Structure formats: C-alpha cells, structure tokens
Amino acid sequence: ETVSVPDEDQREKFLGFHKILEKLFPLVHEHLQKTEIDGNLIFYWKGKSSDKPLVLMGHQDVVAAEGEWLHEPFSGDIEDRKVWGRGSADTKCSVMSFLQAVEELLKEGYVPEQDVYLTSSCTEEVGGNGCPKIVSELKRRGVKPYIVCDEGGAIVQEPIGGVKGYYAMIGVLEKGQGNLLISARSNGGHSSYPPKNSPIARLAAFVNDIEKHSPMKASFEKETEAMFSTLAPYGPFVYRLLFGNLRLFKPLLVKILPMISPQAGALLKTTVAYTMQSGSDGRNVLPQKATLNLNLRYIPHQGMKESNDAIRRIASKYDLEVEEIGCYDYCEPVDIHSSAYAQVEQVVNEVFPDLPVCPYVMTGGTDARFYQEICDACIRFSPVVYGPAQMKGMHGLNEYLDTYSLPGAVDFYRTMIIRNH
C-alpha cells in the first residue's frame, strides 16, 4: 500500500515497497547506481555515451482506495487475466515494466549505448515535491535528457467518439492548471430580511456571467490540429470531411466542438470548473463570507496569466476577491517534427506494428512537467492498453490492468533503450 498523503512524511511506507523491488529485480539493484531521496528513486545505468540520456519514469504512489471492491485493493490478485489493485494501471504497471526490461537486458549482458535513468517519485498524486527533488539531483549531476518518457498517453481504445479501434496516443502537450478561490463578503444577518446582492447572490451572478459570456477563447493549437488530422482517416465520413479539411472547417469546429463534447472542447480552450463552495453554518443565517473554488486548465494560446486576469475582470464587476492557489502554466509542447518524437514513434511502430500513432493533448497533470527545465522532449506515454474500464477505475473502484498489456510494455521499454544510440 503506497497511498500518498499531502504534507506527511511517509518515507518508511515507500522503503517497504523498495524492499519488494529489491527481491523482484536483483540485477537492477546489483548493477545500477541507486539513489533514494525521501522515498523517491533514481537508478542510473551507465552507458557507452552520456550524449543522449534517456529517462524512463513512473510514480510509486497511488490514491486512496475506498468503497467495495471485487478484489482487495492492495491484494495484487491475478484473476480473469487481469491484475487487480490500486496502482495496477496508474502507474505501477510502467514502473514494473521498465524495471523488468532492464532486468532482462542485464541478464543478457547488454550495455546501453547511452546513459539510462529510471526514476520514480512518491508524491505525484498529491502534487508534492518528490519529482522536483529528483530533477534537482539530475541538474546537480549535469544530466540533460534527450527523451523523458512518463505516463499520460497510452494505447487507447476509441480516443474520441466515433473513431473505433486502438491508437497509440503520445502526449506532447500538457495543459497547466490552478485554482482560484473567489470570495464574497458582507455583514451577514438573518435570512428573514435578506438584502440584495448578498454574497451567494453575487457569486451566482458571477458564475452566470462566465457561463453565458465565457472569457475563454477556443482555438486549435498545432498539436490539437495534428491529433484530429491524424485520427480523421479512421473515423466516419463526417469526421473525414471535417477533420480532414481543417483549414476549411476550423472556424465552424471551434464553435461546435465545445457544444458537442466537453472532452473535445477541453482541447481547444482554458476550461473552468466549479468544484467547491461554502457559505454560512446556519440554514437561517446570511454568510459574512461565501467562497467558490474554480479549477482552471490553461491552454497555450490563453495561458495562466491571461486566463486568471480574465476571471479577475469578471469578479471585479461583482465586488469579489480572487486568490490564486497552486497555479502553474502549460508545459512547452514537444516538437512533433523533432528527432526525439520520431524516435518514440519508430519504437511504437516496431513494438506495436498495427497501431496508428497519434500526438495527444493532455488535460491532466503529470510529473513530466518538472523535467521541462532539463529536457525538450518530455513524452507522455504508457505502453499499456487503456479501455473505458481502466479510465474509470484509475481513481475509482476496481482498478485493474489486463495481463496481455504487460509483455508489450516491457518490449517497448527494452526497445526504447536499445534504439537510443
């Protein structure tokens, strides 16, 4: 059990997991240089050259497992050709697969052409400082990775509605995110004589303003355009018509996509979600302070500052205060025409020859963002199959991974190491 909890020292819990890794991967621990930083791991495999270091990464920590499960959430049961348990899909599958890949290569006496780093943080799920500690150590050593490969994209079933089959979705752009705490104040009072423009009424008007006149601009990033263009030939006729002719239909799609699909709309603009609210403690008491939390996911063409400023302008109309909490901007996109991206695409084609490869825009967050300062090609791709059941179970009930996914994942990481020369 490696559930991470914010602001708690849980190093001992993760050291227990590390002892299991020592038993499972003895050659890795014998031949690679291991560094442990507060439960976070770095394994260094010296290659013949240090010119193009490769980082394979995945987090050890998982979210809590609540509710009634078909199998105990930390049992690791293997049944019905599935590995059951919290973390099986998110993302111990990646950690175990790249460790197994290196274990096999060591057994064969293989020496990598380039340096290899296997890294794993223990605070990803709580947005902690585990990965920054790893990156800080790599910076201290002067390591500048050629490619970083983290979670994010995967082998996805039906990536957008109507496009059937499986696709290797390679994450190349990660949206930023942040929270804005909106506060409305008053003198409070009794609910029997409510004034106009009470705190909750002002918050309601504020939300209504955003919903009716959204300040967030929809537009196609070049990575989003590449994603839809790549998937177009595999969709029904209307997809091939619209997405195969984006230059012609882009103005129309910018308007209709957010209305048709929230998922597609999130690829085109900064999104605003209302997640938490508070008022008074009494049913008949007007609050002296009411709050509303907005969770934003920032798109490059309207980044963190511009998006937050747009919200501030609307908030000022209703005499509301705005506090930024944990905001960070979008990640610099990976150049899909770069040699690094081409190398990953080549490996996917070699290991999974029947899978179309497609760039992917990520609306969620990963640890890979911390590597931006030392690497230009932070790829988000887990080489396992994620269908609807995996997507539903990752932070929910009955998380599992199909066992048939694992040999391909190991082969992918083996090939990533071998082809990096």
Regions found by a protein language model. Give the residues of each.
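Acidic/histidine-rich catalytic neighborhood of metal-dependent amide-processing enzymes
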Residues: 83, 89-169
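A common structural junction motif
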Residues: 60-61, 210-215, 312-320
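An extended, acidic, His-containing surface patch that forms the Zn2+-binding/catalytic region
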Residues: 29, 34-38, 42-44, 49-51, ...
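Acidic/His- and Gly-rich active-site-bordering loop/insert found
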Residues: 2-86, 107-114
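Hydrophobic beta-strand positions in extracellular immunoglobulin-like domains
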Residues: 184, 296-298
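A short core secondary-structure module
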Residues: 131-137, 192-216
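Short, solvent-exposed loop/turn segments at the edges of secondary structure
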Residues: 71, 113, 143-144, 165, ...
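Short amphipathic alpha-helices in soluble, non-transmembrane regions
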Residues: 197, 307-315
